[in-house]
From Swiss-Prot:
Organism (species): Yersinia pseudotuberculosis serotype O:1b (strain IP 31758)
UniProt family annotation: Belongs to the gamma-glutamyl phosphate reductase family.
GO cellular component: cytoplasm
Name of this chain's protein: Gamma-glutamyl phosphate reductase
Catalysed reaction equations from the record: L-glutamate 5-semialdehyde + phosphate + NADP(+) = L-glutamyl 5-phosphate + NADPH + H(+)
Transmembrane parts of this sequence: none
Pfam family, one: Aldedh
Gene that encodes it: proA
Stated role: Catalyzes the NADPH-dependent reduction of L-glutamate 5-phosphate into L-glutamate 5-semialdehyde and phosphate. The product spontaneously undergoes cyclization to form 1-pyrroline-5-carboxylate.
Pathway(s) served: Amino-acid biosynthesis; L-proline biosynthesis; L-glutamate 5-semialdehyde from L-glutamate: step 2/2
GO molecular function: glutamate-5-semialdehyde dehydrogenase activity; NADP binding
Disulfide bond as UniProt keyword: no
Length: 419
């Protein structure tokens, strides 16, 4: 039995114990984790500094460096997120529905943990805590495989989690991390279907492709966010600029940040110079289509010609594609062609246009007069999220607690036999 099989077997055994825990016991473990994250913050931050130094030396982009960075404020926020998970309702054991059948069998459908979840992610140290806390709350064990960029941070964080579990009399194997950077171990994890019940990749398109093609475990894909906002012909310009500013500027490296702005041709001449001035204030580079370039070339913001491939990639930086479309249908066609089914928005004062857009755009989250940045487990009231799914089975959008459960049928009889 190799390393991964040992980890898988230990995780499966831990999952049986977790599935039997009361909500109070799970919350106790989460509270201890949150407290230890704070008391051991210097150890975790020092580990993160080692990862940051190595990442800078390797030439990592600013966007990825921002994802990798932990600050005292970010770590404190992560600890508070764990406490928020404590306050969330536990879905495990909840009766979804039930009925008394003509046969006399009392039948109910009850939420239960999935079992063991595998998560593969890249330069996102917060994922370690987010995933672990949600899995523990739902009675699932988890095997984590972070990128080599987060090696020291993940090691320190998982050590804190396992110490907390042991303090609460729970198996440390409930949260395990693959520490070796050997990529062959990823391939082995993808085939560990004897022990792992669901796999969630959080990373770039190549990672998602690898998991879809090689995994023998059910895979939940998503998190790649080529997010769009369409400025309709009757949008309120000043309010639209505030939404665009938030969607692009607040955290450009996030998967729910705005990447492509589509503007109705009827308002392009007036709106685009205003956009240029607003984006200039934040150092945004505009990547303009041939139609948009005449209205942006003399503006304040830096502008370059958009490349065809730009429409299909996440910038994750202070860059924004800008194009002009003839009408709402052209905007929808563009989103269907280049979107990733993550988060897309319309800015409009027309109720009929808003409803048409919502029905036509097949994304996991669609917004009317709101920023795409809202696609987040915390913002949706789900607590920390394990991922944002852009597929339709078994979960869609930010994956909170319910998405980490399945259900079982339970039948109650009085020595009942089938006739």
């Amino acid at each position: 039995m190799n390393l991964l099989e040992h980890m898988g077997k230990a995780a499966k055994q831990a999952s049986w114990q977790l599935a039997m825990l009361s909500t109070a016991k799970k919350n106790q473990a989460l509270a201890v984790i949150a407290n230890l994250l704070e008391s051991e913050s210097q150890t975790i931050l020092q580990a993160n500094e080692r990862d940051m130094a190595a990442a800078r030396e390797s030439g990592m982009s600013e966007a990825l460096l921002d994802r990798l960075l932990l600050t005292p404020a970010r770590l404190a926020a992560i600890a508070n997120d764990v406490r928020q998970v404590c306050r969330l309702n536990d879905p495990v054991g909840r009766v979804i529905d039930g009925s008394l059948l003509d046969s006399g069998l009392k039948l109910e459908r009850r939420r239960v943990p999935l079992g063991v979840i595998g998560v593969i992610y890249e330069a996102r140290p917060n994922v370690t805590i987010d995933v672990a806390s949600l899995c523990l709350k739902t009675g699932n064990a988890v095997i984590l495989r972070g990128g080599k960029e987060t090696h020291h941070t993940n090691q320190a964080t998982v050590n804190v989690i396992q110490r907390a579990l042991e303090q609460c009399g729970l198996p440390a194997a409930a949260v395990q991390a693959i520490e070796s950077p050997d990529r062959q171990l990823v391939n082995e994890l993808l085939r560990l279907d004897r022990y792992v019940d669901m796999l969630i990749p959080r990373g770039g398109a190549s990672l998602h492709k690898l998991c879809r093609e090689q995994s023998t475990i059910p895979v939940i894909t998503g998190g790649i966010g080529v997010c769009h906002t369409f400025v309709d012909e009757n949008a309120d310009f000043e309010k639209a600029l505030l939404v665009i500013e938030n969607a692009k500027i607040q955290r450009p490296s996030a998967c729910n940040s705005l990447e492509t702005l589509l503007v109705h041709q009827a308002v392009a001449k007036t709106f685009l110079p205003l956009l240029s001035a607003r984006m200039h204030a934040f150092g945004v580079t505009l990547h303009a289509s041939p139609l948009a370039m005449p209205y942006l070339a003399d503006g304040k913001a830096k502008v370059v010609a958009v490349e065809a491939a730009d429409y299909d990639d996440e910038w994750l930086s202070l860059d924004l594609n800008v194009d002009i479309v003839t009408d709402i249908d052209a905007a929808i066609d563009h989103i269907r062609e280049h979107g990733t089914s993550h988060s897309d928005a319309i800015l409009t004062r027309s109720l009929s246009h808003a409803e048409y857009f919502v029905r036509a755009v097949d994304s996991s989250a669609v917004y009317v007069n709101a920023s795409t940045r809202f696609t987040d487990g915390g913002q949706f009231g789900l607590g920390a999220e394990v991922a944002v799914s852009t597929q339709k089975l078994h979960a869609r959008g930010p994956m909170g607690l319910d998405a980490l459960t399945t259900y079982k049928w339970i039948g109650y009889g009085d020595d009942l036999v089938r006739s």
